[in-house]
Amino acid sequence: MKMPPPFSASKTQYLFHDESSENSKKSLVSTTLSLSSCENPNKRKMNSDEVLNISCIPRDYKLTQVERKIARMRNLSYQEKAEDEWYGVSTELTLFKDPWIIKKVFHFASVLDMAPNSVSNTHCLLDTESPENAEESLVSLDLCFYDKTWPHDPNVAYNKPTSEEAINLAWMRTMSKRARKEEEKYYVSTELTLLTVADPWTLKMAMTKSSIGNLYRLVLKASFVDIHILRYLPLDDQMMVKEDSGLAVEVYDHDTDSVHNLALKKWAKSSSFVLVSGWRKCFVDRRGLQVGDVIGMYWDRSESKLHFCVLSRSETMDSAPLPPSP
């Protein structure tokens, strides 16, 4: 058995298998000890059909297992890149890469009417695989107040209300007295107003004979006092309102810019509340209230004060007294 001459390394031993002497090249095993096992890549590649999987860079042998995986990830084959693109992921490490890793084509029939050349500062995405159908895959990223694909035809934008819907809306806008009393009973309101801040007078009432008579009291609705006054008072003040003495409150007159002290208490004969201790003198006589005059009131929660104003006068009087000049 003859030994083939060694390639280039000295002090090299070669082992051959006796039964496969005819294919000695395939059974060649090198036992050479060297810093680099691949001084020449062609020496280790015995067969042209075999793929060279051993790295020929000497520093690769000093890398850890994790560093070798990272180095392999940086040099992906075409098959591995195609597999990453198929699953929508990428294991390739780069300093900067196109952020649009996944490119999809969006087809909108309504986008065909858009003219990209007529709009400035418009970015579009096109399908690179089908440049001949570029208009079909056009997607606009232009910033606007509304989507141009929305229907703008008045007949399409909204449905016209039917006769039944119109009747229901009309019924809600014009409530009957029975419905209003039922809402006042449960302290709720379904009446819609455009702006409530412009009209702060939550209580509006017309003067009657009992309001301006010799009874010296103004009867207030229980719903108004419970919702707008009592719920914002401390518990001690709430108890004082329900007692016979009542709670002392300040009433500010907007017309005359004056403050008057009255007492608010619950009327023993009914569930209503009354303003006493100065109502006749401070408001009826001083303001000259008559039957049919409409007054307005509201409770100021921040100052715990009741506000008063004469909204309209009856036909017997032309106008309310003017406020004093500053």
UniProtKB/Swiss-Prot annotation:
<dbReference type="InterPro" id="IPR051442">
    <property type="entry name" value="B3_domain"/>
</dbReference>
<keyword id="KW-0804">Transcription</keyword>
<dbReference type="GO" id="GO:0003677">
    <property type="term" value="F:DNA binding"/>
</dbReference>
<dbReference type="GO" id="GO:0003700">
    <property type="term" value="F:DNA-binding transcription factor activity"/>
</dbReference>
<keyword id="KW-0238">DNA-binding</keyword>
<keyword id="KW-0539">Nucleus</keyword>
<keyword id="KW-0805">Transcription regulation</keyword>
<dbReference type="GO" id="GO:0005634">
    <property type="term" value="C:nucleus"/>
</dbReference>
<dbReference type="InterPro" id="IPR003340">
    <property type="entry name" value="B3_DNA-bd"/>
</dbReference>
<dbReference type="InterPro" id="IPR015300">
    <property type="entry name" value="DNA-bd_pseudobarrel_sf"/>
</dbReference>
<protein>
    <recommendedName>
        <fullName>B3 domain-containing protein At2g33720</fullName>
    </recommendedName>
</protein>
<feature type="DNA-binding region" description="TF-B3">
    <location>
        <begin position="216"/>
        <end position="314"/>
    </location>
</feature>
